[in-house]
Structures are given as C-alpha cells and as structure tokens.
Amino acid sequence: MTNLEQQLSQKLEILLKQTALSITDQQKEQLIKLVLLLNKWNKAYNLTSVRDPMEMLVKHILDSVVVSPHLQGKHFIDVGTGPGLPGLPLAIVNPNKHFVLLDSLGKRISFIRNAIRELGLDNVEAVLSRVEEYHPEQPFDGVLSRAFASLKDMTDWCQHLPKQDGYFYALKGLYHQEEVEELSEKFTIQQVIRLQVPELIGERHLVIVK
C-alpha cells in the first residue's frame, strides 16, 4: 500500500464514522481505488476541477454515498454522470442495484469503462449518449443527477426515463423554492433531504421528485 493509499484509507475511516453508513472493507478498498484512478486520469483528461485526492474523498465519494439510504428500487440511471458521480460510488456500496451511467463526452465514458474493469464492477453500464437521444429498453426506478442547474431542466430532459412510479433524485447545493414553482404540474416534490456530508463546506440537498 502506497503512502497516499494509506492516508486515503485512514481519512475514509474518519469520514465514514461521522455517518450512519455501513460499508464493507472491500467496498472501502474500491472507493479508495476509484479516487486513485480519478486522480491519475484527471492529470491527462481534466475530468474534475478537484485536484487533491483527499478533497476528492469528501467532494466526490462521501458526497455521493450519503445518498445511498434514500434510493428506492433496483435499477437506476445517473444522467450527466461526468466521471461517474454519483453513480460509481453508489454502485460500489450497492452491489445489488444496477446503474446506467450516461454522459455525452467520450473521455468521461472511457474513464468510467476503465474504472468498471479495474474495480471489477458487474452492476454498472456506461453509455455514451445525449440524454434526449437515449431510449432504454426498460424504464428506471430512479433517475439520479448532480449535473442539472434546475429541477425543471432535469425533469424536462429526463421525463422519458423513470417508470410510472419511479423517482427523480436531484443532488443539489442550495435548495431554492423558485425551482419548485418552475416545475411542470405533472411533477411533485416528494421530499427534500438536507444531506450531512462530513467536512464538506456548504449545504447539500437531495430533492426527490415524482
């Protein structure tokens, strides 16, 4: 184990102790490996503005996995996933759920496919496509994203993706009431959850829409 791996491992333990999440040792190792892969690829492909692997643990890994207890169902899509966030961390800690990770940028999907191989994940599929051109064989229990500027954009662009009784899970920083007022009448806010992300400065919310 390299010095960086050791530091990341210790840091992850400290962060997880501040949550109610139950994560196996193997999953912890996979999360660390994901940070190392992202750090390596980021130098060449500029996948994230976060440069420090320690910071990646908080802003990318913890910020993703804290959503895990709120997911209902088995079959999810992460739209505008970027370098696989929140989809890859969620897939690691939910091996019994299946995730499609969608992005329109080739270098991001190449990274995700490499990560799937390196991490030995069999519950993730990476798809290179724009969301409006992607038509799945079966609809999803949940549509996840931390990429959309507004709830209206997310529900408008992704309304063909969830099942009749499926949900949208929007990961957001600040939560503004105006966003709710912009929503089409066919969508309703089910829940707004203030997420506790250890050591993250600023608010994080999960907005669940149906």
Swiss-Prot record:
Q: Which GO terms describe its molecular function?
A: rRNA (guanine-N7-)-methyltransferase activity
Its keywords, alphabetically, are: Cytoplasm, Methyltransferase, rRNA processing, S-adenosyl-L-methionine, Transferase
The cross-references to InterPro entries, in alphabetical order and at most eight, read: rRNA_ssu_MeTfrase_G, SAM-dependent_MTases_sf
User: Gene3D superfamilies, alphabetically?
Assistant: Vaccinia Virus protein VP39
This protein's major location comes to cytoplasm
One Gene Ontology cellular component term attached to this UniProt record is: cytosol
- Origin superkingdom: Bacteria
Binding locations of S-adenosyl-L-methionine: 80, 85, 131-132, 146
Reactions accelerated catalytically: guanosine(527) in 16S rRNA + S-adenosyl-L-methionine = N(7)-methylguanosine(527) in 16S rRNA + S-adenosyl-L-homocysteine
**Pfam families assigned to the protein according to its UniProt record, in alphabetical order:** GidB
User: Which locations, inside or outside the cell, does it occupy?
Assistant: Cytoplasm
For this protein, the Enzyme Commission number is: 2.1.1.170
Q: Which PANTHER family does this entry report, sorted A to Z?
A: S-ADENOSYL-L-METHIONINE-DEPENDENT METHYLTRANSFERASES SUPERFAMILY PROTEIN
Q: What exactly does this protein do?
A: Specifically methylates the N7 position of guanine in position 527 of 16S rRNA.
The UniProt similarity line reads: Belongs to the methyltransferase superfamily. RNA methyltransferase RsmG family.
Protein name (record): Ribosomal RNA small subunit methyltransferase G
Which classification does the entry list for the species? Bacteria, Pseudomonadati, Pseudomonadota, Gammaproteobacteria, Pasteurellales
Q: Quick one: which gene encodes this? A: rsmG
